[in-house]
Amino acid sequence: MSQQPGSARRVNFPEEPMTLGEKFSHRMDQLKEIIADGGCSRAAKCVSITVCLVLLVLIFGGAIVYLVMSLTSSAQKMSADSMDISPQAIRHPKFWPPTDKIRFDDLNGIPMTSLFPQNVSTCSGFGFACTGAVHMVIPSSKRCDGRRDCEDGSDEENCKECQSVFSCKLRPEEESKKKGRSTVQPTLICLTAQHLCDNVENCPDGSDEAVCKSSCSKDQFKCPGSNACLPLSAKCDGINDCADASDEKNCSKCQNNAHKCGKQCIKASHVCDGVAQCADGSDEQQCDCQRCSGTDKALCDDGTCIMRTQVCDGKKDCTDGMDEEDCPGSCTIESFSPKLKMVTCSDGKQYTEAEACSGSFESCDHDCPNSKCHPKLAFTCPASKEARKMCISRRKVCDGTPDCDDGADEINCTPIKECGIAKNTQFKCDHKCLDSSRRCDGVWDCEDKSDEKGCDKCPSGTIKCAADKKCLPAFTRCNGVADCSDGSDELKCSCQECLGVHSNTYMCNESNRCLKRDEVCSPYSMCPNATYTDKAFCAALFLKKSGTSPF
């Protein structure tokens, strides 16, 4: 069938449904034909610019409406889920976050300072805030010292006074014009000795290269192999201005606020910086907020400056352990409970005396006070000339590997071939032979703990798992690990059971649950009915470990 010119139509088969644009175009074609039939034939022959513009406006407007609706929906969902932290970015945090300005907008605005012990200060308001990242604060001792500590170098800008060995004017021509007419201090460029006489002009007037002389004045000295004349005040200031460090040798006293440590001078920027340079830690004592300032520092009330990662890390760094008091996950032990005895083991961390003498922590093998190893849980290795008595786990006894210096843990072991299984006096496990009395006694003698399984009854002073017929050592109660299949050994924990026995545990704020401190956040709080404090603690650690916090 022939078609008349001008009456051609677009054919859309059922399997090709028209889009919104096609439908609109089709309707406009129909409109043009109606107009053409009415006498305006030219309208049917030309493409209406107005129609195209209207179509574009409608499409663009529809896209904007869709985008706005999507963003609004996402925002509402984010608001509704604002208390949740994505479980996909799982971390295993072990250290305290290094800042007091982490934003807790989703946690009712709990500030970092509220999670710090009462006798530890973050010294906010002191130090220098980097211009490009105001959350980054450096101590005043690092301001204008010739070294860039801020990423944008702002700590070395607009300097009116330098703490470096050399300085020059930023704009000597302008300063000379102002001479005698202005009391404004000139802006300085601060340089270290390494930038002097290096054939690179760092100063506009080249004065950093003009200090190269064959001889120096009486109030100056010269480093071996260098022509730079340095002021005598640069000696014994804790800064190696000479390549061979000869300017810091044989110091009877220190200059420029450096700290004397034996015959060594600790430079001012390393005094009260949270890291002990002296063996006695004296460079981190008697500090104040002016010196112990910075994003990653904390000041104890006794004047000790520490890193913020040391706060609430289980190790006492300040007098009387004030940096470990009232931390999130702590609780008040009943007043009638005896004072908990703590032991510092070889890893530098604090453990309860019971833990240190149980043989369960290898870092404490040599640190049990008076070598009084637990009579049931541990095996006591005899003392030797090189070492005192050791407390090792009973699981290491007769395992084929000597752990005691004299091999006492591998003596008098019944060979596996001679194990009297038939007489029911002995049993095998982990390729060793044990007396039957070792079964179901609440002490793990086998590496796989099979000697404490399938028990109908357990002796007093141990824990019985009714669900799976296991006997557990008493110290496993409320240690943050569910050893019973039904978790009954971790239910209804008291403060004494949680913190009075274990060292690395976290008491949930408002529930009788005790968790391992380094496992309480995964990354959200694992505490049942977690409080804002529990959530804030985990949020801070998550942001620190994931690197998403701008602080």
Swiss-Prot record:
Keyword terms of this UniProt record: Cell membrane, Developmental protein, Disulfide bond, Endosome, Fertilization, Glycoprotein, Membrane, Receptor, Repeat, Signal-anchor, Transmembrane, Transmembrane helix
Parts of the chain that traverse the membrane: 49-69
Alphabetical list of Gene3D superfamilies matching this protein: Low-density Lipoprotein Receptor (4.10.400.10)
Glycosylation sites: N119, N250, N509, N529
Naturally occurring in which organism (per UniProt): Caenorhabditis elegans
One MF annotation (Gene Ontology) recorded for this entry: signaling receptor activity
PANTHER family: LOW-DENSITY LIPOPROTEIN RECEPTOR-RELATED PROTEIN 2-RELATED (PTHR22722), MEGALIN, ISOFORM A (PTHR22722:SF14)
Gene Ontology cellular component terms for the protein in this record: endosome membrane; plasma membrane
Domain LDL-receptor class A, chain residue ranges per copy: 122-160, 161-213, 215-252, 253-288, 291-328, 372-414, 418-456, 457-494
Localization in the cell: Cell membrane; Endosome membrane
Extracellular topological domain: 70-551
Function (record text): Probable receptor which is required for the oocyte-to-zygote transition although its exact function is controversial. Redundantly with egg-2, seems to be required for fertilization probably by promoting the interaction or fusion between sperm and oocyte. Conversely, shown to be dispensable for fertilization but required together with egg-2 for the formation of a continuous and cohesive eggshell chitin layer by maintaining a homogenous distribution of chitin synthase chs-1 at the unfertilized oocyte cell membrane.
Protein name from the UniProt record: LDL receptor repeat-containing protein egg-1
Cytoplasmic compartment segments: 1-48
Gene it is expressed from: egg-1
Domain of life: Eukaryota
Keyword Metal-binding: no
